[in-house]
Amino acid sequence: MQEIQKNTKKEQYNLNKLQKRLRRNVGEAIADFNMIEEGDRIMVCLSGGKDSYTMLEILRNLQQSAPINFSLVAVNLDQKQPGFPEHILPAYLEQLGVEYKIVEENTYGIVKEKIPEGKTTCSLCSRLRRGILYRTATELGATKIALGHHRDDILQTLFLNMFYGGKMKGMPPKLMSDDGKHIVIRPLAYCREKDIIRFAEAKAFPIIPCNLCGSQPNLQRQVIADMLRDWDKRYPGRIETMFSAMQNVVPSHLCDTNLFDFKGITHGSEVVDGGDLAFDREEIPLQPAGWQPEEDDTALEALRLDVIEVK
């Protein structure tokens, strides 16, 4: 019995550390990009997946101790996909006491009508969903729209654009919506997916499958995701270093004439960004930038416990 109690205490301690790490990551992202301001009404887009559940939980937790006042309203879009469990999210949100709105729109029927059988439906579905969420944000008086994309999503998008789109473009932590009316934020921008997976398992969130529509997964994104996971296993710290690189861009050492005036460089010009060694190899640190040794997370694997609230 004492051994069981000892293990339980250790598990709760490790889970508490995990929640603290996620909370710290979200807090830093919010501060770095000024995501949330005094009086904001945040529309939290809740899909029923691990990422959006985690985002809502951490934002609720931060709300209790933040130096500014902001409110949350959770929004789920019921797209009338066959087998969608309509009762799960309302029951979960009512239990938490979170304000919410379920938006019912038969986008599934529209997509099935417009897209031939066997073709990827994600592009049209995404456009329809985006428009509905923008409209809903206006109706609710939301000042910010929060999406659950995390650090791994941002890196995957960067490599997708480099490999297939020929551009260095990622997924911004904060942006103006394409209709020019809404500010979109990604509070999980600094969070690792593996931390989110462990947290979701520990909290036993009522996960709703993401493939109810029957659409094929994005194979290109899957290839990139597998590549990054392999790198993370074989070369610890590489993921952290690549994400750090996205925050430390040197336009004068790339090739985009829209970002830097290469033609303007003449004899007598000032040295820019430290210049270039030109003929010498640049010194590279032995340890990856931004990397920290992995904490002992073995006790976090496959746990389904209530996490201690961090105040």
Swiss-Prot record:
<comment type="subunit">
    <text>Homodimer.</text>
</comment>
<keyword id="KW-0067">ATP-binding</keyword>
<keyword id="KW-0408">Iron</keyword>
<feature type="short sequence motif" description="PP-loop motif">
    <location>
        <begin position="47"/>
        <end position="52"/>
    </location>
</feature>
<keyword id="KW-0819">tRNA processing</keyword>
<dbReference type="GO" id="GO:0000287">
    <property type="term" value="F:magnesium ion binding"/>
</dbReference>
<keyword id="KW-0694">RNA-binding</keyword>
<dbReference type="InterPro" id="IPR035107">
    <property type="entry name" value="tRNA_thiolation_TtcA_Ctu1"/>
</dbReference>
<feature type="binding site">
    <location>
        <position position="122"/>
    </location>
    <ligand>
        <name>[4Fe-4S] cluster</name>
    </ligand>
</feature>
<keyword id="KW-0479">Metal-binding</keyword>
<dbReference type="GO" id="GO:0051539">
    <property type="term" value="F:4 iron, 4 sulfur cluster binding"/>
</dbReference>
<keyword id="KW-0004">4Fe-4S</keyword>
<keyword id="KW-0808">Transferase</keyword>
<keyword id="KW-0963">Cytoplasm</keyword>
<dbReference type="InterPro" id="IPR012089">
    <property type="entry name" value="tRNA_Cyd_32_2_STrfase"/>
</dbReference>
<protein>
    <recommendedName>
        <fullName>tRNA-cytidine(32) 2-sulfurtransferase</fullName>
        <ecNumber>2.8.1.-</ecNumber>
    </recommendedName>
</protein>
<keyword id="KW-0411">Iron-sulfur</keyword>
<dbReference type="Pfam" id="PF01171">
    <property type="entry name" value="ATP_bind_3"/>
</dbReference>
<comment type="pathway">
    <text>tRNA modification.</text>
</comment>
<keyword id="KW-0460">Magnesium</keyword>
<dbReference type="InterPro" id="IPR014729">
    <property type="entry name" value="Rossmann-like_a/b/a_fold"/>
</dbReference>
<keyword id="KW-0820">tRNA-binding</keyword>
<keyword id="KW-0547">Nucleotide-binding</keyword>
<dbReference type="GO" id="GO:0005829">
    <property type="term" value="C:cytosol"/>
</dbReference>
<feature type="binding site">
    <location>
        <position position="125"/>
    </location>
    <ligand>
        <name>[4Fe-4S] cluster</name>
    </ligand>
</feature>
<dbReference type="GO" id="GO:0034227">
    <property type="term" value="P:tRNA thio-modification"/>
</dbReference>
<comment type="function">
    <text>Catalyzes the ATP-dependent 2-thiolation of cytidine in position 32 of tRNA, to form 2-thiocytidine (s(2)C32). The sulfur atoms are provided by the cysteine/cysteine desulfurase (IscS) system.</text>
</comment>
<dbReference type="GO" id="GO:0005524">
    <property type="term" value="F:ATP binding"/>
</dbReference>
<dbReference type="GO" id="GO:0000049">
    <property type="term" value="F:tRNA binding"/>
</dbReference>
<comment type="similarity">
    <text>Belongs to the TtcA family.</text>
</comment>
<dbReference type="InterPro" id="IPR011063">
    <property type="entry name" value="TilS/TtcA_N"/>
</dbReference>
<dbReference type="GO" id="GO:0016783">
    <property type="term" value="F:sulfurtransferase activity"/>
</dbReference>
<feature type="binding site">
    <location>
        <position position="213"/>
    </location>
    <ligand>
        <name>[4Fe-4S] cluster</name>
    </ligand>
</feature>
